Design a protein with these regions (language model features):
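PAPS-dependent sulfotransferase catalytic domain
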Residues: 1-122, 132, 138-139, 152-163
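PAPS-dependent sulfotransferase catalytic core
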Residues: 47, 106-109, 165-212
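Short beta->alpha linker loops
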Residues: 48, 70, 128, 148-152
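Short, contiguous clusters of charged residues that form electrostatic/catalytic patches at enzyme active sites
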Residues: 51, 127-131, 155
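A short, terminal or domain-edge coil/loop segment
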Residues: 84-92, 125, 129-132, 197-210
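Active-site oxyanion/phosphate-handling segment shared across diverse enzymes
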Residues: 119-148
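C-terminal/domain-terminus segments
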Residues: 143-179
Length: 212
């Protein structure tokens, strides 16, 4: 069962690319926290893909991966705003966010670090994630790296996925400024619920037996 995984960090355009692929007819989950959500979706973006891409690569062989880049001077302040808003809900014991999302953010951003919101810390997290992605996919043809703000980036994505695209198409610009929930407000029949329940109810994957 092959998938398309969007493994860029939050605030790099994960919502915009998710909406663009929805409009192409894909079933898309922007965040997925159950096995069934992954089974239903053709495309999965954001958490936990940006932290779990190695495990997902093993669970879904022959899938494609898209890493999203963003100019650091724009990404850092955007991420600072996001983490400021999310922080109370990411707390291990009292935060109400899904445990998979909490783990994904903790693993990537070291939420307990006293310097969490500083430019230096976030830049270091960005660089570490980028380097790890580049190292893991080195020499492989199943990873595409794009900056969705760059001209022609949508055409590059469609070519990578084997889709037709005209030169006048562009990525939608969503979640700009302080907005963080445009995905919830976007109505589309192909959206997949992040908490979709199947035969295993709302169980997530067990990574313990994977050779990582």
């Amino acid at each position: 069962m092959t998938k398309i995984f969007i493994i860029g960090l939050p605030r790099t355009g994960t919502t915009s690319i998710s909406v663009a692929l929805l409009e192409c007819g894909f079933n898309v989950a922007h965040t997925a926290f159950t096995q069934h959500a992954f089974e239903l979706a053709d495309v999965i973006s954001d958490s936990p893909c940006f932290s779990d891409y190695q495990q997902l690569d093993l669970l879904f062989p022959n899938s494609k991966f898209v890493y999203l880049q963003r100019e650091r001077s724009k990404w850092v302040p955007s991420m600072q705003r996001l983490l400021t808003k999310m922080a109370p809900h990411l707390l291990p014991k009292t935060g109400h966010f899904n445990p998979v999302l909490k783990r994904s953010f903790m693993q990537t951003f070291e939420l307990s670090n006293a310097q969490l919101l500083t430019e230096q810390h976030l830049s270091r997290c960005y660089e570490k994630h980028q380097q790890q992605v580049e190292l893991y996919f080195n020499g492989r043809s199943d990873l595409l790296s794009i900056d969705i703000s760059m001209p022609g980036s949508l055409q590059t994505l469609f070519t990578f996925l084997g889709l037709d695209c005209n030169d006048n198409q562009h990525f939608p610009h969503l979640n700009q400024g302080t907005q963080v929930s445009n995905w919830k407000n976007y109505k589309h029949a192909n959206k997949i619920n992040s908490l979709s329940a199947g035969k295993n109810h709302r169980r997530f994957f067990d990574y313990h037996d994977l050779p990582i």
